[in-house]
Every structure is written in structure tokens, then in C-alpha cells.
């Protein structure tokens, strides 16, 4: 399955929020030596992960840009210029119910979004990791080639 249409579908779900909040979106479509990047995945769950990550980026970004790009051939990045995640919270962000100091100030935070993303990514064979700096934003990395499929 081509990744570009899946990513565009997920981005479109938030287009009005980007416009209403005057946030910039930078999207660089994926490509490989054949022109388009493809992967075997479950469309519904892959889009769920992308949409959850975009929702988080929008929730914690007051101004600036959310960027979606490939930092390496098979590593998708969703980067924001938001408030960032405190260093002491980073090791626990994928724990069920953990909201960290940002989540405690946001009444809508459940501590389930990143937990579900991690579980779904594991089932899809996708690695997920996060880097963040307070006041500088967050970058989520999805390693799409972490578990190569073997022909049987």
C-alpha cells in the first residue's frame, strides 16, 4: 500500500483545525527509488496512529508548524513546535494512563493516546520513539522497516 494517500487522508481530517488555529503544516510526501514509498500495513490502524500523533501535536502546539517528513528512507517524523515534554516525563509517556505534567494541565488528556499508539505500532511491526525539548517541540519517529517481512 502506498503511504502518501494514507498520510494525506489522516492530514485532511485535521485541515480545518490547522486553518482555524492558523498553524502551518509542512508535508513532504514519502518516496523511494521507485518514486513512492509502499508498505504492508492495516490502513485503519496505521491511520489511527497518525491521527493520534497529529491530534497530540495540535493539542500541544499554540503557534508555529507541524511537519511530516521522512528523516531517513523508512523513518517517518511528525514534528511540532509545541510546548515539548519534560525530560522526567519522556521515559514514561507510553505507559497506560500516564499524562505527565502537560497532561495534568490539560483536562482532555487521558494518558491513553500514546499507550495505544505504542501497542498498535508493535502489532503493525512499526517502531515508535519520541524526542522532545521543553519550549522547542516534539518529534515522533515511526520506524517503518523495523521488522522486515520474510517470505514463507
Language-model features: locations:
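Conserved micro-motifs of the catalytic ATP-binding
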Residues: 34-41
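Short beta-strand/loop element within the Bergerat-fold HATPase_c
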Residues: 63-75
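Glycine-rich ATP-lid/hinge loop adjacent to the conserved G-boxes
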Residues: 98-108
Amino acid at each position: 500500500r502506498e503511504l502518501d494517500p494514507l498520510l494525506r487522508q489522516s492530514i485532511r481530517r485535521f485541515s480545518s483545525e490547522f486553518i482555524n488555529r492558523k498553524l502551518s503544516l509542512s508535508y513532504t510526501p514519502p518516496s523511494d527509488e521507485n518514486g513512492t514509498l509502499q508498505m504492508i500495513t492495516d490502513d485503519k490502524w496505521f491511520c489511527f496512529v497518525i491521527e493520534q500523533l497529529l491530534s497530540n501535536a495540535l493539542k500541544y502546539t499554540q503557534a508555529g508548524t507541524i511537519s511530516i517528513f521522512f528523516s531517513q528512507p523508512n523513518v517517518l517524523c511528525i514534528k511540532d513546535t509545541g510546548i515539548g515534554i519534560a525530560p522526567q516525563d519522556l521515559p514514561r509517556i507510553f505507559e497506560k494512563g500516564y499524562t505527565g505534567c502537560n497532561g495534568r494541565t490539560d483536562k482532555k488528556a487521558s494518558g491513553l493516546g500514546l499507550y495505544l499508539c505504542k501497542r498498535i505500532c508493535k502489532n503493525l511491526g512499526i517502531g515508535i520513539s519520541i524526542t522532545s525539548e521543553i519550549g522547542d517541540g516534539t518529534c515522533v519517529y515511526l520506524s517503518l522497516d523495523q521488522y522486515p517481512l520474510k517470505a514463507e
